[in-house]
């Protein structure tokens, strides 16, 4: 543009445009000058630019006056396109920013400036938004009402000016979206003043009416006519919005925050600024022109916006007087030209309409888009179809910001799903949609009718507010729903993937999620202001009814969900969880609803409002499924899905923070709400309730909460097929309580679960949960809850029916009673112990116990038939008291050991040794994990040799029993009570074989040292060699336990190493007393030798393990040394090295015979390794390291040697060692010291019994 155009634009201030004084002063000369301006416009470059400017101003003022008059006559511009809902606030804001589109339209169409206006304003164009845009407003406003005049003003100027104005206007719009700069604000404000005055005022009026409609459901009638007039006259329609969206992308790019991404913090700030503008402008203009008071939020916006108007101080004062005339003029222009229809092509006028979607549209848009779809489907007259197309277009167009493409695709899918779901919802709740559709001839009419029809039900009351807001969102939905549908989809995707996995049968969840995304918008927008206040009231009432219903239907569930909801409510700040809050809101919304208006605060508040209002809107979505969610949610399944979806999305969003807890709660509440709505899903309610309770118990952990969320989701998905698992669990529990057989039956049905109902329930739940999630299974059920429920069940288990009680697993080994008498006596106490023990036990362990206990029960039944009623307890001296041949006792002992081990494992679940340790006094030593795994495998391998009964049990028992038996029979030296243990295969030994009961009380090294010395002194005093060797071996076992205690104690690792090394020497000495290799060697001798070799092998292995770090260091040091030494001075061959290194002649080197030289040199080097002639000189440090390294590594060699020797001897005594392996679990090189000690003590006890030693 030339300097004249620039000067003209600069001088075209809004002050002149809005200044009443100037207008009044120049009214007389304006007519003539306007005519002259036409010719002068053709000669833009005439020198008298000042005159042109003056004339132009006068012309504009005249046009403004004329337009204002004519505009007043046909004011109805934005009848339907602009929802009266609070979403209009966003519309006003956006229109404030986009309000210049009417003016821009002419320039775009006539000057082909669309590229500038449609696209992001070119930075090259000077952005003097205040003056130029003011001029632009004036020029455009003139251009529309009097394009010829505009053209006459300046043939070239119009083009340049429009371009600049378009650019500046676009930039002004951007800035209007973000009113940071005064000029920008001015431009945006002025442009938006016109657009808003035309569009915004109509919208505000419509909004006010809609608000009233929200409240009364009647005022919408007023608005529809006006809106209809506007709609028909101006051509602005929600339908037009899709084009606006098309142009909007650039606008979105310019200020996406204004309306493109309602969920984003960006729009929130821009929303506030646009809101202020639209509110003040719309409030002032609406009040001035339509006489329609802005809504309370609008008044607030007006206040805020007034503040913003104050920002552009240049034209603000002059504008204030002329605002009305200008606004009227603008409105008239908008009305005159139905430029909106023309602007629709530019697709910016529509964005100007969308401007209101900023927050409200965001909030309402999603909801509205859904309701509109619902309305369209139900057959809502204009808005339904237009909104549906608009929604689709908007979703597609508004998505171009960032996720636009994804959102568009998702929304398209969502629409398809939503359509199907809408059809379902329409079918299910067709009456409400139809009533809404029928009632809503216009968006406001639809809202009023929908509110009327929906006020019928509590949920419908929510629908009412949401539908009205959604209708106001009619134009908004495209932006908001697409942006928010996008966040919703993104949020839902994370959880949707999850839910889809869990509940693949519920695509409605996705639909609902996306709908929730829009619903979030609804949540945010409607609750934010108008709906938050107006609709909030109705929803609150309806919500109260819903609350009553919900309380009735899901009192307990609701309690938990509401508790969760409370958290979400408090977490409403989390904002992203609103969708989840939606579900929660459905459940807990009633309490949250009152806060919805409060939440109408800015974006963050919006999100929080999103939660609480989300509840409202969720109800609205559920209740208004026809309007909001119905399009996307099938009623019953979708409601369920919606509840799931809502939670799912929030969880997705919530993963950001403590949202999980809120999510879980929201899931519960949403589940509750959905359940209420679907009623048919009430069965799910108890199940979810169970899970919720479980979750509440386990809610302490976020993972638990997640799992619980998953559980709920799983429950939702699974609930239709299964009536409440909770009920099943309860029934199973009751059946278990009724009888052990029943409990076992329930276990069988549930899947081998522990005899204890708790384990049944836990396993059942676990199975269900496992289908959901492979991880966190132990956490799915809160151990507290399980333990509580299980306690009664455990107590009800009739222990008297069991000759042996493997369930003592949870008991302390001391509590375990080997004799049947002890079993019966200690059964109650031990059983009581078991309950708490299992409580402590992780779920997995419990499950394991369950499986094992089932097997044990079977074994017990068989054993109960076979076992003799009484068992004798051996004296602490390991004396066999009586021959109690209980073939099954052996198998029973295995389960007992296994169970004991299982119970022990909870103490240190990570260490197999703990499991084995079970009763070992060396609980501290149980930390060693290495031994048990191998033992288990070994035991499983050897177990096939076990009795047929044991083999049948082997599947579960061998695994657990071997592990447990490895550690289960810990040695309690002074307390070796014997249980008659009869291997089924060895009937002759049945009377002799008794199982020792090991006391697993943790004891200090000093205790074991005393015991070892006592046994050693006893052995020293004995004369009989075999008995002496036995006592030495037992003393060695005590020394091993002492070393193990040292190893686990505070003492340095060297102490146990020394103890083990001394023990090795003691065992070797004991073995020398009684040889096993001679022809006179007895089987007992060989058996004792095999046990001693086992001990030696493990001792050496353990010694190496203790010194392994040192060995590694030594190895590295030696390798480095030799590597470096070889490089520094390569050792010469024996015959050539003498002269090289020392220079002194070597007597051997002259010898021609290399052999002699080698021999002599070899002897020389061997005799004196440091001999300089050999270069083998090694530092003392290296020599010592080599020696230590060799001694350490030799332990491995010794270990394997002794192990092979023990295996050879064991093969010669397979019967004995098979029985021992079955009872105690096989010993391997990786067995723990505790297991080794118990294993050896049991074997020594049998040997002592076989030779009748006391």
Curated annotation (Swiss-Prot):
Where this protein primarily resides, as one coarse class?
A: nucleus
Highest taxon of source: Eukaryota
Disordered: annotated segments: 45-90, 139-190, 261-324, 350-534, 552-752, 813-883, 919-991, 1128-1171
Keyword list, A-Z: Activator, DNA-binding, Nucleus, Phosphoprotein, Transcription, Transcription regulation
Q: Name one GO biological process term.
A: response to tumor necrosis factor
Q: List the InterPro entries.
A: AF4/FMR2, AF4/FMR2_CHD, AF4_int
Q: What GO molecular function terms would the record report?
A: DNA-binding transcription factor activity; double-stranded DNA binding
Under the heading Gene3D superfamilies, the entry gives: 6.10.250.2670
Q: Using the record's annotations, give every residue carrying the modification Phosphoserine.
A: 782, 908
- Expression sites by tissue: Highest levels found in lymphoid tissues, lower levels in brain and lung.
**Family that this chain belongs to:** Belongs to the AF4 family.
**What's this protein's function?**
Putative transcription activator that may function in lymphoid development and oncogenesis.
Protein name as catalogued: AF4/FMR2 family member 3
Q: Which organism is it from?
A: Mus musculus (Mouse)
What lineage is on file?
A: Eukaryota, Metazoa, Chordata, Craniata, Vertebrata
Give the gene that encodes this protein.
Aff3
